[in-house]
Amino acid sequence: MSKDFDIRHSNAGNIFLGVLAIATIRDFIEISLKGRELIDPLNPSNSLKTYFLHFNSFYFLVFVSLSLILYFFARKKTCISECFKIGALAMALIWLGPLFDYFAFGHFDMTYPSDPLFVVCNLHHFVDPNFSYEGLSKGMRLEIILAGLGGMGYIYYKTKKIIRSVCGGICLSATCLAIGLLIPFITQYYEYGLNFGYHKLYNSTLLHQGFVVHGAGCKIALFYIFLCIILFSLAYYIRSHNRFFAIIRNMRWTRSLHYLVLFGAGIMFIYHNPPIPNPSLADYYDYLATIWNHPIDLFGIFMASVAIFLSFQSAVIFNDIYDYGIDEVSNADRPLVTKAISQSEYRLIGRSFAILALTIAFCIHETFFFFVLLYQMMAFLYSAPPFRLRNYFIASNLELAIIFLVTLHAGTTVLIPEYRFENVPHHITFGFIICYALALVVKDFKDYEGDKKSNVHTLYTLFGIKIGNFATAILVCCATLLTPLLLHLSQLIVFSGIVCILFLLAITFVEKRNIKEMTVTSLYFIYVLTIFYFLIFQQQGTYIDYH
């Protein structure tokens, strides 16, 4: 029997769902023993985020950390997959803490240690039942000790080395404690320097500044999710170097950058073009003033960008799955074509990226979650049968243009969730869609052979390479010349004319596919960045009006 995950039976997915189930049961035990309402009727969304995202992301971080430590100390006698299975089973220990505290002492109250430095300086009392730490109950200490003992036993069973086993057990317990102390250390050091003491964690300015992420618990969850992404990536690299690098190479980095540029442009647009004051919304504008007078939450914006990036990567994976026949002819280096990864495992990774992107988006706020979900649904219509709009170049170009617009609007909602789609002038919205829909025909050149074999309708498959190149050049030139007119950027008409000529030369006379793609892509980024610069910085305060 293989030591690795049998992806065909979804063992990897079952393990992660099992850990999620264990963590959710722990949430329910905690809520029940505290005597609180399951969902606060006054703020149901925040309750759900706190229990399902904040706490569960913490437990996932513990799970992946412990699994990697087990592998590190027993790696010569085990595999990363087995360590993840053992780690998942060991997570059942998290039920013990609240139950032990409640039945042994009659109460349970889980919180973060109020003075992390005090805990570190008094670790020699950790196993002393008569010594107390604020925010670190005896049940939680019991969980940490049992995790270390269990890990010690597993490492000894695999290696038969006592010193290695003891070191592994100590490292496991220390890691559990360190994860619990990490956020208190970061927030208190940020706000009070080395003056540690009793401070309210959830009142820390670090967890509230910038107003991108609404709620301290959500920002903590994002921090844990970020660490989980790093550690899960490390685990997948350990599991298979070849598969890991096959996915990295296939991430379409240029197109990823394109989506991040659109997303960043949306953020910059709303930041430099704040809503026009309206006396009837005085309280709301006090809120806006608070945003603009505080430091920008760079971590929140970074994680929002990660959500956009992961959404695109999920779309790439599913597009590769449905484009397998085309890629066999036109893109022989794709992971599925080279057999670097199985389709079932590739599909599982795509689903994981999509779920992770939605989770991050929900941590930020519901409006951003909606735009990320909308992005993923439109990407599904583009790639998946029976709709598969990708087969029809007019429909596919129009949908991709709308997806680009959705990405731009996702950026505008990050700073202001209440931002209304209809308040962007129609000439910008329709100009954006029309210009991209015309220009996107250029993407079909590189897949000509595969599209022709699979009966995909593009300008190239309908009219051939020569006429297709000419028609593509004309449409791209039209898009380039229309852009300053539709967006009311008359100062860029001459610049657009120059770029138009360069596009025409690159598309018509450059024959090698790689050189043509690189040239057109470089011209595109130069042109788009110039357009966004003038749109954002040269016409401030002219577009957005709330009434």
Q: What do these predicted regions represent?
A:
Residues 2-547:
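Multi-pass alpha-helical membrane architecture of UbiA-family
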